[in-house]
């Protein structure tokens, strides 16, 4: 089995960080978050990290790291996928449009596929909620208000 951690910008739908590995430990989600922080364009903006109630997000290793990097933590109130709709949508796209629903031969293949999928998703896949723009375009052009989210 392989486990995937994603950090997605809710405004632009851009996958900011990701990590795939054979375990679902706090280090998996922490490394995805580290990648996301490195990829930020707008370091002056506050970050709210929203996740489900998985133990890897609630443990001190992750929560301390996130808070030490100035993030507010938010979790779903119940175990309801509708409370984490952006994450569920991106997971579904990766599974069904990019082939992550099937069993892959090994972790190396999965990592290569994931890197390619994230690149295509961020730079080529247009979203109706982004006025048919790509996540990368929306992330770099935040003056526009899209259908799902607006800047505060």
Which stretches of residues belong to each language-model region?
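C-terminal domain-tail junction helix/linker
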Residues: 67-71, 93-152
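Short small-residue beta-strand/loop micro-motif enriched in glycine and branched aliphatics
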Residues: 12-18, 74-76, 100-101
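Active-site beta-loop-alpha junctions of metal-dependent nucleic acid enzymes
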Residues: 18-42
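RNase H-like two-metal-ion nuclease catalytic core shared by retroviral integrases
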Residues: 51-53, 59-62, 73-95, 108-110, ...
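Short, surface-exposed connector motifs at secondary-structure boundaries
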Residues: 14, 43-47
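An active-site-proximal beta-strand-loop segment
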Residues: 1-16, 22
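Short catalytic-loop micro-motif centered on adjacent basic/acidic residues
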Residues: 19, 48-51
């Amino acid at each position: 089995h392989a486990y995937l951690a994603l950090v997605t910008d809710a405004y632009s739908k851009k996958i900011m960080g990701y990590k795939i590995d054979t375990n679902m430990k706090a280090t998996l989600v922490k490394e995805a978050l580290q990648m996301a922080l490195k990829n930020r364009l707008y370091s002056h903006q506050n970050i709210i990290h929203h996740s489900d109630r998985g133990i890897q997000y609630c443990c001190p290793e992750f929560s301390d790291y996130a808070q030490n990097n100035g993030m507010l933590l938010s979790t779903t109130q119940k175990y309801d996928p509708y409370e984490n709709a952006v994450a569920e949508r991106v997971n579904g796209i990766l599974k069904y449009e990019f082939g992550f629903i099937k069993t892959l031969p090994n972790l190396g293949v999965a990592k290569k596929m994931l890197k390619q999928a994230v690149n295509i998703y961020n730079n080529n896949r247009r979203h109706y909620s982004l006025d048919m723009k790509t996540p990368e375009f929306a992330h770099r052009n935040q003056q526009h208000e899209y259908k799902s989210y607006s800047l505060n």
